[in-house]
Design a protein with these regions (language model features):
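N-terminal secretory signal peptides that target proteins for export/translocation
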Residues: 1-15
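Bacterial N-terminal signal peptides
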Residues: 11-12, 19-30
């Protein structure tokens, strides 16, 4: 409120600061460092048995850790990555190549809803990237992609005997017959 001068009585004129709000926000955004969500470096992928998915993402450049677990009753891997060395888009590309996204509630010999294909996004940027990459990946398949794309919920790590399964169990028949051929097809080495 402003006092109007030259008046015998005190009058106040209301000036709204709201008209300056866009300018204030723009100036603030220009001079303040951009804050990234701590979740921006985390991605969740469900591509069948988490032993396979874990082994694939452990070989991806820029990935700093992979944890096998469960999200929304699907075997899922939590992938932490360094955005200076890789991008979510590159990880999505690897995800599509690492499994058959047209299979419903199954991957290879593993069947059941827990083996479904799913992408769990942590923010709107990941959501948009996942939808875009799914549309792009669909061009490579004659059948419809069954991968669900949904907001990430609570992630529950699997017991320790499921973590780093391929590294800990290199002679396991599942590793030899399922994981190793998958890694070879992708041009990746066994972890």
């Amino acid at each position: 409120m402003w006092k109007v001068r030259g008046s015998s009585s005190v009058k106040y004129k209301s000036k709204s600061l709201f008209r300056f709000l866009p300018l204030i926000l723009l100036v603030g955004m220009a001079f303040c460092p951009r804050v990234q969500s701590s979740q921006a470096n985390v991605a969740y992928f469900a591509g069948g048995c988490f032993w396979c998915t874990e082994a694939v993402f452990q070989q991806a450049p820029g990935v700093t850790s992979v944890v096998s677990g469960y999200m929304q009753k699907a075997e899922t891997v939590q992938v932490t990555f360094d955005p200076a060395k890789t991008t979510y888009d590159k990880l999505l590309n690897l995800f599509w190549r690492a499994h058959d996204p047209t299979e419903v509630d199954a991957q290879g010999p593993d069947t059941g809803k827990q083996y479904r294909s799913a992408l769990f996004f942590v923010d709107e940027q990941q959501h948009l990237a996942a939808e875009k990459s799914k549309a792009q990946a669909q061009k490579s398949y004659s059948k419809s992609i069954a991968t669900e794309i949904t907001r990430a919920g609570s992630f529950r790590p699997a017991p320790e005997n499921h973590q780093n399964f391929c590294r800990k169990n290199p002679n396991n028949p599942y590793v030899r017959q399922i994981i190793e051929p998958k890694l070879k097809k992708l041009g990746l080495k066994k972890p």
